[in-house]
């Protein structure tokens, strides 16, 4: 179970950090580990929020509970741009602080939410939108790995390839196709 392994490794890491750093040894998580979720979350899933509450209550280590409650929803809170376009679900996923969507990264970013999709119609629509967007991107340029949200141009426009303003980067690798197939499957 990937969640169990993540929690185990996080606990191990936190115990190592606590041993080396007195700042992390603070028992009161209101000082060092103050949780700050964005006030304007981009996408909210009540199912994911309920799971965060459920798991956090089970964790005896407050720092680990804080880490879990901030990590699990981070993609939803900060990178998901869901909308309908021409009556169809469409989801553009920012990759970190860059306002572009990488095929590999967007698939990996939403992967943890698949387990909640059966219970959450809103989450299903968002995931369907990611798959639709990835397919649309691949059909637009099968050799690109990262796309803009429309014809905005960008830093890599001077690449020695057939760049178009809808492309962020044209550096295709096999995982540029594997991750969309994995997500759609």
Task: Put a short name on every predicted segment.
Residues 3-12:
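Bacterial N-terminal signal peptides
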